[in-house]
Amino acid sequence: AKVTAVSSSTPATPSRVQVVLDFARAQIGKPYEFGKAGPTSYDCSGLTLKAFAQVKVSLPHQSLAQSKLGSAVDWKSSAIQAGDLVFTFSSLNMSQISHVGIAISSTQWIEAPYTGGVVRISALPSASKIQAVRRFL
C-alpha cells in the first residue's frame, strides 16, 4: 500500500521548553538590573522567573529559592538539557548559590550576568562551578 504524507496548514505547537527559550532569547541585549523581572531590564532570577511564567511555571524571584524547586539533575553524570536551570556560586561566597541561567544546550546558557552587563548567550560554567541543575519541564 502506498503511504501518502498528510500535510497540515497548522504549525506544530512549540514545546514548553521552546516557549521558555524563545522568550529568553527575545530578551538578549536588555540590561541587567538587580531586582528587575522585565520588561526592559532583568536580574538573573527575574529572567528565569519571567521565561518560565510563559508556560505557567511559577518561580520565586531569588536564585537560591529557585534552586530548591523542580527535579534535581546530576550534571556530572548526565547531560544538561535545554530548558534546565543552572545555578552557580557567588565568587564572593563559595557556599552560596547566587546566580542562575537557562541552559539552551549542553554547552550554552542564556543569563542576565551582572550590573553593567546585558542578557546574553554564553558558555555554561564548568562543572566545578555549577552548584545545582534543576529541571522543570
PLM region spans:
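Intrinsically disordered, low-complexity
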Residues: 1-31, 78, 125-137
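Generic alpha-helical structural context detector
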Residues: 22, 49-53, 111, 131
